[in-house]
Amino acid sequence: MTDAQGFDALASLSSNPEAAAPAEPKIDAQGRAYATGKRKNAIARVWIKPGKGSITINGRDQEVYFARPVLRMMIAQPLEVTDRLGQFDVVVTVEGSGLSGQAGAIRHGLSKALTYYEPGLRPVLKPHGFLTRDSRVVERKKYGKAKARRSFQFSKR
């Protein structure tokens, strides 16, 4: 093998790290994959296993926990993108933040759990941004201001 061929092979490995070592599924003894997701101050612990497609959040069905259809749709996005809707039973415990932050945390955790269960789904989920932690949090209030950026009303006289 010449130096040029060796360099090309090395360059292809470094540009595509997933080709170097195929990831193995991370599944526990019960056949479940576990992951955590975060969004704002919400932390979601997500377990997935093959099943009929039920989603249980804090011991309640998703229709009961999230009354707004937009939030339920947000949770189901990773399953829809990967064509796995109705194939996995999802059990979630989530705490902190509000309903929107919790839905975002569940979506993040579910996406990570899907990649742990089936590593081949990572290239499908990554372009949609489901595996990226959304780092936006509330800006703190500053002294001398009414809110984070809003000033008190100014009076000339």
Swiss-Prot record:
Coiled-coil region(s): none
One Pfam assignment: Ribosomal_S9
Gene Ontology process terms (BP): translation
GO molecular function, one term: structural constituent of ribosome
Origin: domain of life: Bacteria
InterPro entries, alphabetized: Ribosomal_Su5_D2-typ_SF (IPR020568), Ribosomal_uS9 (IPR000754), Ribosomal_uS9_bac/plastid (IPR023035), Ribsml_uS5_D2-typ_fold_subgr (IPR014721)
A GO CC annotation given for this chain: cytosolic small ribosomal subunit
Keywords in alphabetical order: Ribonucleoprotein, Ribosomal protein
Family in the record: Belongs to the universal ribosomal protein uS9 family.
HAMAP family: Ribosomal_uS9_B (MF_00532_B)
Name of the protein: Small ribosomal subunit protein uS9
Lineage: Bacteria, Pseudomonadati, Pseudomonadota, Alphaproteobacteria, Caulobacterales
